[in-house]
């Protein structure tokens, strides 16, 4: 297993002719904390979406916890990223917002969602 928690090699995301992320190589050692700072449109959110499995790269490789590219679904439940916009739907309850996010990761267990809400004091 690699000494790195996360490694990207030539990671690229292209929308039409625009490269939002262009051949990024990154190696994050276990126990490290990183932040991404840059102007609007620099590709920060696009990069985070790719490494968290919410978007597929146009090219390049992602390795996390020993899993690569298509195998990353095996670690999705163990990773998270905090993006400055909250990504919540104002017209939905806390339960419904959480259920939407859980479905993105293949989690459809009502008890799981209820336990999370109870943990943070939002049950009922």
PLM region spans:
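Conserved ABC ATPase "signature" region
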Residues: 99, 103, 110-124
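Short hydrophobic beta-strand immediately N-terminal to the Walker A/P-loop
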Residues: 34-36, 48
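Short coil-to-beta microelement around the adenine-binding A-loop and adjacent beta1/P-loop entry
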Residues: 18-19, 73
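Conserved ABC transporter NBD signature motif
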Residues: 60-75
């Amino acid at each position: 297993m690699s000494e790195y928690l996360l490694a990207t090699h030539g990671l690229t995301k292209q929308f039409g002719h625009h490269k939002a992320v262009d051949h990024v190589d990154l190696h994050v050692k276990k126990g490290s904390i990183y932040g991404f700072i840059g102007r609007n449109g620099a590709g920060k959110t696009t990069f985070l979406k790719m490494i968290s499995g919410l978007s597929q790269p146009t090219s390049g490789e992602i390795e996390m916890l020993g899993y690569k590219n298509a195998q990353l679904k095996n670690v999705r439940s163990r990773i998270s990223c905090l993006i400055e916009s909250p990504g919540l739907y104002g017209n939905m309850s806390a339960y419904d917002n959480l259920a939407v996010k859980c479905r993105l990761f293949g989690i459809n267990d009502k008890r799981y969602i209820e336990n999370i809400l109870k943990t943070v004091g939002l049950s009922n």
